[in-house]
Amino acid sequence: MIQRMNNFSKNDIISIRDLSKDDLEQIYSKTNEIMEMDADQRREIARGKTLGYLFFEPSTRTRLSFQSAMALLGGTSFGIADATSSSVQKGESLADTVRIMSGY
Protein backbone atom coordinates (compact mmCIF):
# COMPACT_ATOMS: atom_id res chain seq x y z
CA MET A 1 0.00 0.00 0.00
CA ILE A 2 1.25 3.47 -0.84
CA GLN A 3 2.24 5.67 2.09
CA ARG A 4 0.94 9.21 2.47
CA MET A 5 3.45 12.02 1.98
CA ASN A 6 3.62 13.22 5.60
CA ASN A 7 5.89 16.19 5.02
CA PHE A 8 3.91 17.66 2.14
CA SER A 9 3.51 21.37 2.89
CA LYS A 10 0.16 22.07 1.20
CA ASN A 11 -3.38 20.74 1.36
CA ASP A 12 -4.67 22.93 -1.46
CA ILE A 13 -2.63 23.73 -4.54
CA ILE A 14 -3.62 26.72 -6.61
CA SER A 15 -0.39 27.17 -8.55
CA ILE A 16 2.88 25.30 -9.08
CA ARG A 17 4.43 28.25 -7.22
CA ASP A 18 2.69 26.98 -4.07
CA LEU A 19 5.06 24.00 -3.98
CA SER A 20 8.52 23.95 -2.47
CA LYS A 21 11.49 22.12 -3.95
CA ASP A 22 11.06 19.43 -1.27
CA ASP A 23 7.37 19.07 -2.21
CA LEU A 24 8.30 18.55 -5.86
CA GLU A 25 10.95 15.98 -4.96
CA GLN A 26 8.37 14.06 -2.89
CA ILE A 27 5.90 14.19 -5.78
CA TYR A 28 8.48 12.85 -8.24
CA SER A 29 9.49 10.08 -5.84
CA LYS A 30 5.85 9.11 -5.20
CA THR A 31 5.17 9.16 -8.95
CA ASN A 32 7.97 6.66 -9.53
CA GLU A 33 6.56 4.45 -6.77
CA ILE A 34 3.08 4.54 -8.34
CA MET A 35 4.41 3.82 -11.83
CA GLU A 36 5.95 0.57 -10.52
CA MET A 37 2.55 -0.67 -9.29
CA ASP A 38 0.21 -2.80 -11.35
CA ALA A 39 -3.18 -1.41 -12.42
CA ASP A 40 -5.11 -3.15 -9.62
CA GLN A 41 -2.83 -1.65 -6.98
CA ARG A 42 -3.13 1.81 -8.54
CA ARG A 43 -6.93 1.63 -8.45
CA GLU A 44 -6.79 1.37 -4.65
CA ILE A 45 -4.82 4.59 -4.13
CA ALA A 46 -7.75 7.01 -4.37
CA ARG A 47 -10.63 4.60 -3.73
CA GLY A 48 -13.24 6.47 -1.71
CA LYS A 49 -11.63 9.84 -2.47
CA THR A 50 -13.10 12.68 -4.51
CA LEU A 51 -11.26 15.44 -6.35
CA GLY A 52 -13.09 18.74 -6.71
CA TYR A 53 -11.92 21.24 -9.31
CA LEU A 54 -12.84 24.75 -10.38
CA PHE A 55 -11.35 26.26 -13.52
CA PHE A 56 -11.65 29.99 -14.15
CA GLU A 57 -10.48 29.59 -17.72
CA PRO A 58 -11.35 26.86 -20.22
CA SER A 59 -8.76 24.11 -19.86
CA THR A 60 -9.93 20.95 -21.58
CA ARG A 61 -6.62 19.06 -21.47
CA THR A 62 -5.92 19.83 -17.82
CA ARG A 63 -9.46 19.02 -16.71
CA LEU A 64 -9.48 15.73 -18.62
CA SER A 65 -6.03 14.85 -17.24
CA PHE A 66 -7.27 15.38 -13.68
CA GLN A 67 -10.43 13.36 -14.31
CA SER A 68 -8.52 10.56 -16.00
CA ALA A 69 -5.89 10.41 -13.25
CA MET A 70 -8.53 10.15 -10.53
CA ALA A 71 -10.35 7.41 -12.43
CA LEU A 72 -7.13 5.45 -12.97
CA LEU A 73 -6.39 5.73 -9.23
CA GLY A 74 -9.89 4.52 -8.32
CA GLY A 75 -11.32 7.87 -7.24
CA THR A 76 -13.99 10.17 -8.56
CA SER A 77 -13.95 13.81 -9.60
CA PHE A 78 -16.40 16.62 -10.05
CA GLY A 79 -16.19 20.30 -10.60
CA ILE A 80 -16.79 23.35 -12.65
CA ALA A 81 -15.03 23.41 -15.98
CA ASP A 82 -15.74 27.08 -16.62
CA ALA A 83 -16.33 29.65 -13.89
CA THR A 84 -18.95 31.39 -16.04
CA SER A 85 -21.24 28.48 -15.17
CA SER A 86 -20.70 28.86 -11.41
CA SER A 87 -22.29 31.06 -8.78
CA VAL A 88 -19.07 33.10 -8.68
CA GLN A 89 -20.34 34.69 -11.89
CA LYS A 90 -23.46 35.80 -9.98
CA GLY A 91 -21.42 37.38 -7.20
CA GLU A 92 -20.89 34.48 -4.78
CA SER A 93 -17.44 34.67 -3.25
CA LEU A 94 -14.79 32.16 -4.27
CA ALA A 95 -14.49 31.17 -0.60
CA ASP A 96 -18.21 30.30 -0.50
CA THR A 97 -17.96 28.28 -3.70
CA VAL A 98 -14.97 26.33 -2.37
CA ARG A 99 -16.72 25.78 0.98
CA ILE A 100 -19.79 24.36 -0.77
CA MET A 101 -17.68 22.14 -3.03
CA SER A 102 -15.65 20.82 -0.08
CA GLY A 103 -18.82 19.35 1.39
CA TYR A 104 -19.02 16.82 -1.41
Q: Which residues does each PLM region occupy?
A:
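Positively charged, low-complexity intrinsically disordered leader regions
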Residues: 1-64, 68
